[in-house]
Design a protein with these regions (language model features):
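A Rossmann-like FAD-binding core segment of flavoenzymes
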Residues: 9-131
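Short, well-ordered coil/turn residues at beta-beta hairpins
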Residues: 2, 117, 123-124, 147, ...
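Ferredoxin-type iron-sulfur electron-transfer modules and their immediate structural context
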Residues: 6, 126, 134, 158, ...
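FAD-binding beta-loop-beta segment adjacent to the flavin cofactor pocket
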Residues: 126-144, 149-155
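Internal hydrophobic alpha-helix adjacent to the cofactor/substrate pocket in enzyme cavities
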Residues: 12-27, 59, 139-146, 158-171
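Beta1/beta-strand and adjacent pyrophosphate-binding region of the FAD-binding site
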Residues: 1-7
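Residue-level signal for short, function-critical loop segments
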Residues: 5, 63, 149
Length: 171
């Protein structure tokens, strides 16, 4: 998976889970996280039942920072832990060189490697699309640009909701 933002992490979780998400089944969730719901163990904790993925997944980002550093402060560690437990390989500072029959060629630091992949998922960000806005604005229509159409980098739902609310109140 090229791109380790929120969408890249969500796709990695989806691709590495077997069956329905454990978040839909309280007993499966408790087992995955080592929660002893019967309190047979001290502190109500037991050994987590990790389920490695049947797929080999690489999660790459171009930034040198910690993979997933831009995820939510209160949930980022959860997403990183789930993927780590499923055997996902995190690669930061990746320079994408090419894709061929051998796989994805990347350079990390001074070394180059080929990741032997048969499928590549692009979660590499988005570009704002302002074409319609420009046409409507030039025509004199009362239009506003908000959310990802305004700033697509690191989409921020709170910012988009705030902007949408402000526009709605002003109408």
């Amino acid at each position: 998976i090229m791109g380790a933002g929120g969408i890249g992490f969500d796709v990695a979780e989806y691709l590495t889970q077997s069956g329905p998400s454990t978040s839909l089944d309280p007993q499966a969730w408790a087992a995955e996280w080592g929660v002893d719901t019967a309190y047979r163990q001290a502190g109500g904790l037991t050994e987590p039942q990790e389920e490695p993925s049947a797929r080999k997944v690489f999660l790459l980002q171009r930034k040198d920072s910690k993979v997933g550093a831009g995820l939510g402060r209160t949930t980022g560690w959860i997403h990183r832990t789930v993927l780590k437990n499923r055997g996902v390989v995190f690669i930061a500072g990746a320079v994408y060189e090419r894709i061929d029959d051998a796989g994805l060629h990347v350079r990390v630091g001074e070394g180059s490697t080929v990741l032997p992949v048969d499928t590549i998922v692009l979660a590499t960000g988005q570009e704002p699309m302002r074409d319609l806005y420009a046409v409507l604005d030039e025509s004199g229509a009362d239009v506003r640009l908000i959310g990802g159409a305004d700033v697509a980098a690191e989409l921020d739902a709170k910012r988009a909701i705030k902007q949408g609310t402000e526009v709605a109140v002003s109408i």
